[in-house]
Amino acid sequence: MEQIDKQKIADAVKVILEAVGENPDREGLIDTPMRVARMYEEVFAGLKKDPSVHFDTIFEEQHEELVLVKDIRFSSMCEHHLVPFFGVAHVAYLPQNGRVAGLSKLARVVDDVSRRPQLQERITTTVAEIMMEKLKPLGVMVIMEAEHMCMTIRGVNKPGTKTITSAVRGAFKNDDKLRSEVLALIKHN
């Protein structure tokens, strides 16, 4: 993917500041357009990445029971309003034939999928689909909890509300006991 055009972003931010009645050349705002451009380059860094590459290296271990990495902090930008949403992801899978991923790789996939204009529902589904395709586990369960600034600072103005999404694949879809185990472990401190 091409590099992000920071100058184009900075020019657009300057136009926005003028459109809302601000003077983009005043002290305090003079460097804001380029600061915003650099911020977008960082928060949209996932656009330039293929998150599935984190699972190119798989380890062979004699472990075929639940693996859960919980409370993976993430942030993203709502594609509808370009304001942040942030929260935690809980990612579980049931290895098959001893195929396990490095634990940090689960967090890296969540980060790469999140760092682009996004919807929480899509992040949840995409993480689950990548894991099913690359790890070939018996099942995957991804649960994400997030606060959306588009609900907090505008519109309904409901600070503190959380949106929870889930993607359930394979063995987790048909096994209530397995699903319940994941949910209990997520709640457990």
UniProtKB/Swiss-Prot annotation:
Its EC number is 3.5.4.16. It catalyses: GTP + H2O = 7,8-dihydroneopterin 3'-triphosphate + formate + H(+). Pathway: Cofactor biosynthesis; 7,8-dihydroneopterin triphosphate biosynthesis; 7,8-dihydroneopterin triphosphate from GTP: step 1/1. Gene3D superfamilies: 1.10.286.10, 3.30.1130.10. GO terms for biological process: one-carbon metabolic process; tetrahydrobiopterin biosynthetic process; tetrahydrofolate biosynthetic process. It holds the Pfam family GTP_cyclohydroI. GO terms for cellular component: cytoplasm. InterPro entries: GTP-CH-I_C/QueF, GTP-CH-I_N, GTP_CycHdrlase_I, GTP_CycHdrlase_I_CS, GTP_CycHdrlase_I_dom. It comes from the Bacteria. Keywords: GTP-binding, Hydrolase, Metal-binding, Nucleotide-binding, One-carbon metabolism, Zinc. PANTHER family: GTP CYCLOHYDROLASE 1, GTP CYCLOHYDROLASE I. Toroid-shaped homodecamer, composed of two pentamers of five dimers. Belongs to the GTP cyclohydrolase I family. This is GTP cyclohydrolase 1. It comes from Listeria monocytogenes serovar 1/2a (strain ATCC BAA-679 / EGD-e). The lineage of its organism: Bacteria, Bacillati, Bacillota, Bacilli, Bacillales.
